[in-house]
Amino acid sequence: MIRTKKMKEDKTSLTRRNFTKLSMAALGTLPLMGYENPLYNVIPKSSDDIEVYLFSKHLQFLTYNDMAESTAEMGFSGLDLTVRPKGHVLPENVQDNLPKAVEAMQNFGLPPRLMTTNVLDAEDNEQRIVLETAGKLGFTHYRTGWLTYPEERSIPESQTLYGQQFKNLESLNKTLGLIGCYQNHAGKHVGAPIWDLLPILGATDNEFIGSQYDIRHAVVEGGSSWELGLRSIRPFIKSIVIKDFKWGKVDGEWKPVNTPLGEGMVDFDRYFSLLKKYQINVPISLHLEYNLGGAEHGATNISIDKREVFKQMKKDLAFLKEAWQKAE
């Protein structure tokens, strides 16, 4: 079950005049965002060379050392480390345990680069400590928590408030050398339609905060129009998530059913061709949300042999690299 974080209300009241000014200012910046930014989306390397990080949620049945060793042996660039409630590193223990996790990673040649968090509020002390600790250890990108649209507030009003919230978070990120990435997630989350993120991210400088584009969730929500969403959000993409799905009946209801890569509805040939066309080559987080004996849900004890989990991880990684190479 997806958990959403209820956001604190902005203490500063918005007059209708100020709201209109903020909205127009955010929208007015959209055509310029990203294209002239020196940090825009591109890692300086060959277009055929990608960095693939394994989402550590799927290895939470392992110690830090075993997690790092297995990830290195499977051929990943590194880990997208879960630093959140029920993650590999709990936020309240981040100062003690994140250095331990990083030490284990570095012992096997894995750089600290990506992490997944519940961070959303630059003024929250625990969240600040998470970012400060990560910045000191060399992380560069993190996924934020998710936002929702409260019923008691209009969506445009929420977008304006969240735009200011992200602008404040970006200021903190800048001092720490971190890039915050908001993931589009299917359902009633902010960002599910993709288009609704434009005024929110458009209120920022698009340097130290942006989008973590998730093609699986984009296709669930966008169907055959997902390309338009990608085209609109592309100036803001700072990292991406890779996974696959198909529609199926579950207990009599049609629902998205997660699958291994290449066995679902995501058109990876077209998707990767567009990423190359748009010159988007950012860190990739590989997720495996289909049945892996509980590893898909972040279980600390799994019901299948760990070698079967590793086998599927290597299979998805091989598919991903081959599909990227073949895309034109």
Name each model-derived stretch:
Residues 50-56, 79-81, 112-117, 142-144, ...:
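Hydrophobic faces of well-ordered beta-strands that scaffold small-molecule active sites
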Residues 82-100:
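Glycine-rich, proline-tolerant flexible connector loops at the mouths of alpha/beta enzymes
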Residues 94-99, 128-129, 158-166, 194-196, ...:
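Charged helix-capping and loop-helix junction motifs
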Residues 86-90, 150-154, 221, 294-295:
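A short acidic, helix-capping loop that chelates divalent metal ions and anchors anionic groups
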Residues 67-84, 137-138:
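Catalytic domains of carbohydrate-active enzymes, especially glycoside hydrolases
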Residues 2-51, 62-72, 135, 194-209, ...:
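Histidine-acidic metal/acid-base catalytic patches
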Residues 23-32, 66-68, 104, 120-211, ...:
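Active-site acidic/histidine proton-transfer and metal-coordination neighborhood
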Residues 55-59, 82-86, 117-120, 147-149, ...:
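Active-site beta-loop-alpha junctions enriched in small/polar residues
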